[in-house]
A protein has these predicted regions:
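Blade/loop signatures of beta-propeller domains
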Residues: 327, 333-358, 621
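A short beta-strand motif characteristic of beta-propeller blades
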Residues: 358-364, 398-403, 439-445, 479-486, ...
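Short loop/turn segments immediately following beta-strands, especially the blade-tip
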Residues: 517-524, 613-619
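Beta-rich, blade/repeat-based domains predominating
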Residues: 364-379, 405-424, 428-429, 445-463, ...
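Beta-strand-rich domains and repeat architectures in extracellular enzymes and scaffolds
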Residues: 342-347, 359-388
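Non-catalytic cap/lid and distal C-terminal segments of serine-dependent acyl enzymes
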Residues: 25-324
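Bacterial N-terminal signal peptides
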Residues: 7-18
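Blade-level signature of beta-propeller repeat domains, shared across WD40, Kelch, NHL, RCC1
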Residues: 588-631
Length: 631
């Protein structure tokens, strides 16, 4: 294979992405040779294709986010005939020396085992930060783990459309394949599941079919849905990951059995390796031959046979040790500490809290309680809008009355200027109070309905109007404007800034998806996405999000109907904390507080509660850049 771009780096990896929740070394299994075979070696007399590198500009599906990709074109490509193609997610790894897809294609096309096909190696998008003081937004989980057709539509409507400007690509779905590893395996399958009119041939290696963003629902969905004409090759290993989202070694056979049950053409390769590309790479030639056998005959759905799916489970061998494993035969697993992930695969919630440090009530029971907010000294203020009072809780848990006759003030936030800001819904205005307790109340803005506020270090105030479904901003000069009115957020209820104040997170009290917007230099909201995916209650139609907060690692904490849901930076819900009281009374706010900002405060049923955590909250006057997340 010839590379046309000088210095075009390729990845040689034995393990691409460690699963969240931590990894541990498993007992070594029997030695297995997963070295690359003859199909993966350059062969004498075989024509070499070319590989070029490109950048796809941001588009409508992932706004503000460019994508890098490479295109392999076989030597046998004929511009006069529409060409088949395959798309490889996390493409640099597939194109690199560890997997050698271009070499394998050279050899198999030369032997006429495959039609002359192009290969597209696309990497997940990264939305660049606006400054080096802010963190990028990493789109891999959002792109690959989502069950919606957004990513498939992006591939067809933007990526393939761009490549088709230079090459004659077939528009027949029978000529299209897609492959992915780990989370990319989910992305590959979901793309074909949602758009079988575009993709019919699928490869997933060590697919992350656990409950990250709902992929664990797929087996049941497959069994209940009219079969779709796709052919699927799957691979997993006995020493693959086990974490809060499930067991890879069990979830993959569940998927394969469901596909077999539905009548799909499916094959699963069970091996001894961990979360690695080695096994899949060692059988890539065989995999591609199986996937494209009998081409150009169209892929159809067969009639399920009695007992379909049972044979797959019969291949499973009980493991002596059910531990999270990567087992890279000498390769150390990458550390995830910087991303805030726990040290162990089980009880991952205890990376956030201690099991013996439970919720404690602060103060009495009030007519109402909402809008917890932290000041510089660790004191937490909360509102009783029914009684028109604001209370102050100190670090020791003592509660005193801070203000009376507040005209129903709520949506409390402490600004960088040291004042307490609040929204008075009845009088349609935003006010601020001096924290000294002096009778110093300033009207910040009038004729404004603000259900929640988010304050920046520079003095801008973002507000959300739930009824009008808009987000607005008051800048430091007092200028007011609407920065979101798109209508996609069903019930915008809550706001918070990311730790670096580069993005605004908007809670949706109805939908499961919470929104992430980049804040432009002029304060406008751009590049919005339904980014964080929450779990939904079995009863009721709504997420019930009433408040948002973030910690210094960039995790979002959402007060919701299910409890406190914690989403890691890339948007996956990793943990759910119990509500202080196990009843139907909703949470009404959430905030970090205490002198070290390590206490989590929530309000529920007219009460203020707190508990210690292992995380640190952030404040308006001290933006911090969170670490790059583990993907």
């Amino acid at each position: 294979m010839k590379t046309l771009v000088a210095g075009c780096a390729v990845l040689a990896v034995t393990m691409w992405f460690a699963g969240p929740g931590g990894v541990a070394q498993a007992p070594a299994g029997p030695p297995v040779d997963y070295s690359l075979g003859p199909d993966s070696q350059p062969q004498a007399g075989v024509p070499h294709g070319t590989v070029t590198r490109h950048t796809l500009a941001p588009g409508k599906f992932f706004p503000g986010t460019p994508h890098t990709y490479q295109v392999y074109v076989p030597a046998q490509y004929d511009a006069g005939r529409p060409a088949a193609y395959m798309i490889f997610l996390d493409g640099s790894g597939y194109a690199g020396d560890a997997v050698r897809v271009p070499v394998v294609l050279d050899n198999l096309i030369a032997k006429h085992d495959l039609p002359p096909m192009l290969a597209v190696f696309i990497d997940p998008g990264v939305m660049p930060a606006l400054s080096d003081q802010a963190q990028n937004r990493y789109e891999r989980i959002f792109e690959y783990d989502s069950l919606t057709p957004r990513f498939a539509n992006f591939l067809i409507g933007e990526l393939v459309a761009e490549i088709a400007r230079s090459y004659n690509l077939s528009t027949n779905s029978n000529d299209h394949g897609i492959a992915g590893l780990s989370t990319g395996g989910v992305g590959a399958f979901v793309a074909a599941w949602n758009r079988p009119d575009q993709f019919r041939r699928v490869i997933t290696w060590i697919g992350s079919f656990g409950n990250f963003r709902g992929a664990d629902r797929l087996p049941g969905l497959i069994r209940r849905t009219e079969p779709r004409p796709i052919r699927v090759f799957m691979q997993t290993g006995r020493q693959d990951l086990v974490n809060y989202a499930g067991s890879w070694y069990l979830e993959n056979p569940r998927m394969a059995a469901a596909l077999e049950f539905a009548g799909n053409d499916v094959r699963i390769e069970l091996g001894e390796d961990g979360h690695s590309n080695r096994h899949g790479a060692s059988v890539l030639g065989e995999t591609l031959r199986w996937l494209w056998r009998d081409y150009p005959q169209p892929i159809t759905v067969g009639t399920p046979q009695p007992g379909a799916g049972r044979g797959i489970f019969a291949q499973l061998v009980p493991r002596r040790e059910m531990v999270a494993a990567t087992v890279n035969r000498g390769a150390a697993p990458p550390a995830n500490a910087a991303a805030g992930r726990g040290a162990g695969p089980r009880g991952a919630v205890y990376a956030l809290i201690d099991r013996d440090k439970l919720w404690e009530q602060v103060g009495d029971t009030y007519k109402s309680a909402a809008s917890a907010a932290l000041d510089r000294d660790g004191n937490v203020y909360f509102a009783d809008p029914v009684s028109s009072r604001i209370y102050k809780a100190d670090a020791a848990g003592r509660v005193t009355t801070f203000k009376e006759q507040t005209n129903g003030a709520q949506a409390l936030r402490v600004g960088a200027d040291g004042r307490l800001y609040a929204s008075q819904l009845a009088s349609q205005r935003v006010v601020s109070y001096a924290l000294s307790g002096a009778n110093d109340v300033s009207v910040v803005a009038q004729n404004i309905h603000a259900n929640d506020l988010a304050l920046t270090k520079t003095g801008s105030i973002y507000f959300v109007d739930t009824a009008k479904k808009i987000v607005g901003v008051l800048d430091a000069t007092g200028r007011r404007r609407t920065v979101y009115s798109g209508g996609d957020i069903m019930s915008p209820t809550a706001l918070t800034l990311t730790p670096d104040q580069a993005m605004l997170l908007v809670g949706d009290g109805m939908d499961r998806y919470q929104w992430s917007f980049q804040i432009a230099v002029d304060g406008a909201l751009v590049n919005g996405e339904p980014f964080q995916r929450l779990e939904m209650p079995e009863e009721g139609l709504f997420s019930g999000v009433t408040g948002l907060s973030v910690d210094s690692l960039g995790y979002m904490w959402a007060a919701s109907a299910m409890g406190i849901q914690v989403c890691e930076q890339p948007g996956r819900c990793t943990n759910i904390l119990n509500k202080p009281e196990f009843n139907d009374t909703p949470l009404t706010s959430i905030a970090f507080g205490g002198p070290d900002r390590a206490w989590l405060y929530v309000t529920q049923g007219g009460k203020l509660f707190r508990r210690q955590t292992k995380r640190t909250g952030v404040v308006a006057w001290e933006p911090v850049k969170p670490p790059q997340p583990g993907l």
